[in-house]
């Protein structure tokens, strides 16, 4: 087992913010990654068409308030929180699998957090 100096644990929990009949699920409960590697977290949408939604990703670090990270709108426009290093987070939406993925590049100790996905039906 690697020590905390070599790994970061990314806890993943689902947050449901849907207006309508959709359902949101994060199938991966937790993820442990080696520092400086890439982590990918998925959010699966059912009950509605993902391309008719905007998906938002947030994180909550231990002892801190929830922070908006990045979103992808129904038209594919990506919006990122100011102050977050460029290239740190990527978001995509895959209509064929009704999935949104948050990619975290160069995992650091500061990335230890609970990550939430939410969606807004257009």
Curated annotation (Swiss-Prot):
GO biological process, one term: adaptive immune response
Listed GO MF terms: MHC protein binding; peptide antigen binding
Compartment annotation: Cell membrane
Keywords carried by this UniProt record: Adaptive immunity, Cell membrane, Disulfide bond, Immunity, Immunoglobulin domain, Innate immunity, Membrane, Receptor, Signal, T cell receptor
Annotated Gene Ontology cellular component terms: external side of plasma membrane; plasma membrane; T cell receptor complex
PROSITE patterns in the record: IG_LIKE (PS50835)
Domain of life from the UniProt record: Eukaryota
Matching Gene3D superfamilies: Immunoglobulins
Main location, first listed in the record: membrane
Signal peptide (from-to): 1-20
Disulfide bond sites: 43-117
Segments forming domain Ig-like: 27-122
Protein role: V region of the variable domain of T cell receptor (TR) gamma chain that participates in the antigen recognition. Gamma-delta TRs recognize a variety of self and foreign non-peptide antigens frequently expressed at the epithelial boundaries between the host and external environment, including endogenous lipids presented by MH-like protein CD1D and phosphoantigens presented by butyrophilin-like molecule BTN3A1. Upon antigen recognition induces rapid, innate-like immune responses involved in pathogen clearance and tissue repair.
Subunit comment: Gamma-delta TR is a heterodimer composed of a gamma and delta chain; disulfide-linked. The gamma-delta TR is associated with the transmembrane signaling CD3 coreceptor proteins following the stoichiometry: a single gamma-delta TR heterodimer associates with one CD3D-CD3E heterodimer, one CD3G-CD3E heterodimer and one CD247 homodimer forming a stable octameric structure. Upon activation, gamma-delta TR complex associates with FCER1G to initiate intracellular signaling.
Name of the protein in its database record: T cell receptor gamma variable 9
Gene name, Swiss-Prot/TrEMBL: TRGV9
């Amino acid at each position: 087992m690697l020590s905390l100096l070599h790994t970061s644990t990314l806890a993943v929990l689902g947050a449901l913010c849907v207006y309508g009949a959709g359902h949101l699920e994060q199938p991966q409960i937790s993820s442990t990654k080696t520092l400086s590697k890439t982590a990918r977290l998925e959010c699966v949408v059912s009950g509605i068409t993902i391309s008719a939604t905007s998906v938002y990703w947030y994180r909550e670090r231990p002892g801190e308030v929830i922070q908006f990270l990045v979103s992808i709108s129904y038209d594919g426009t990506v919006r990122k929180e100011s102050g977050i290093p460029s290239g740190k987070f990527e978001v995509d939406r895959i209509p064929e699998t009704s999935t949104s993925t948050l990619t975290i590049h160069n995992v650091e100790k500061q990335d230890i957090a609970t990550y939430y996905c939410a969606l807004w039906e257009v």
